[in-house]
Amino acid sequence: APVILERAGRVLLTPEKEVALGGFINGGESYVINSNPRLPWCHVLSSRQFGTLVSDMSLGFSYAFNSRELRLTPWDNDTARDNIGERLILKTSDGRFIDLIQGSTAVFSPYKAEYLFKGWGYSGSAELSVSDKGLCKRLRVKIRTDSPAELMYYTEPCLGFSRRHSSLILPEIADGVLLLSSCASEVKGWMSLSCSQK
C-alpha cells in the first residue's frame, strides 16, 4: 500500500519587519515564511564546488561542481511543483508518516535554511547548511517526541544530468556510510550519506 505523508505543523514567528508572506527576523539577517506561497519559495545555499536548492516546503535537490551536469538528486523545472528528491520523514509509533519539512515554518539566511515544526506528539527543528570548503551538506535535526519514533532521510539519487540512468547507481556500505556511484555519470565520483546521533 502507498505511504500517505502528512504535513508537519507550523511554528509561527513574529517578524520584526513584515514583508510579503512573512518578514525579516534576527535584525534583518533571516527571512521567515509564515504562510503558504502559491509557488515554492526557493533558497540557494552553495560554495564554489557544491550547492543545494531548498524551498519553504522541501529539501529540494543537491549538486556537485555543476548544477546541470552533476545533480546528486533530481531537479524538476516545473515552477508549480517542488523538487522532492530529498525529504525528512518522521514515522510515529502509531504508524503515521510525517514530512517534517512540508508544512513547517521556513527561515532562510545567507548561510542556512531552518525549518521549525510541531504537531501532535512531536516538535523540533531542522537546520541545513553547506560547508565553505569541500562537498558537504549538513542537516542537524532536534526533535522531541512523546513516544518512540523513527527519523528517516529519504533521498532519490541521480548522480548525473537526469534520472534516466539511475538504475546504474551502485550502492555500497562502508563503516556505516552509504556510498553511491554511477558508471553512467559524466563526472566520476561518489556520493555518501552518513548519520550521527548525539
Give residue spans per PLM region.
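Anionic coordination/interaction segments
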Residues: 1-198
